[in-house]
Amino acid sequence: MRRKAGVRKRETAMGDLTRVFIHGLDSSSRGTKGSFFRERYPEMLMNDYFGTLEERMIQLEAFLAGRKDLILIGSSFGGLMAALFACRHEPLVRRLILLAPALGLVDLGEYYSKPLFLPVTLYHGINDVVVPPEPARRVAARIFANLDCRFVEDDHDLHRVFPTLDWDGLLETGKSGHS
C-alpha cells in the first residue's frame, strides 16, 4: 500500500483510550478524513451512519456500547453526534475533537442540564458557508466549560488545515495538539 507524502502510520499504542471518528452527513468512514485516520491510526474505530439524527444516534450508541475512555472526533454532522453522545454519556468520554460541528441544527438544551467539563477542541473554518462558525461557537461555549475554540483560515471541509494538525497531540488526553 502506498502512503501519501507526509502521512505516517502511528506505530506505538496510544494507551487504553478508545479513539472514534464520526463522519459527517454526506460522508462516510471512507471519506478524506476517515481515510487519513485509517492510514495513520489503524486502531481508530469508525462506522458508517445512515438516516435521521436519532437513527444515527441509535447506531452510534450500539457501536460504542460497552466502551469507555473515549476520544470522539466528529466532523460536521458527526460533530453534532459526538456532542450529543457526550451530553448523554459524559463519564464515558475523555475528550471531544469537533471539526466544523453542526451544533446549531438541534436544540441541545434538552440533552444537558449543566455544562460538561471534559476537554473539547473545536476547529472551524472562517470561510465555512455550510455551518457558520459563530453560531456553532456560541452553542459549544454554552455546553462545554473546557472549550478550546480555533477559527482557522479554511472552509467547511477543513482540507487545508486538517492534515496539518498535530493529531498525535490531539489524540492524547491533556494535550492541546496545536502546532
What does each model-found stretch correspond to?
Residues D48, C149-D155:
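Short glycine-rich catalytic loops that host catalytic nucleophiles or stabilize transition states
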Residues L92-L103:
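A conserved short beta-strand
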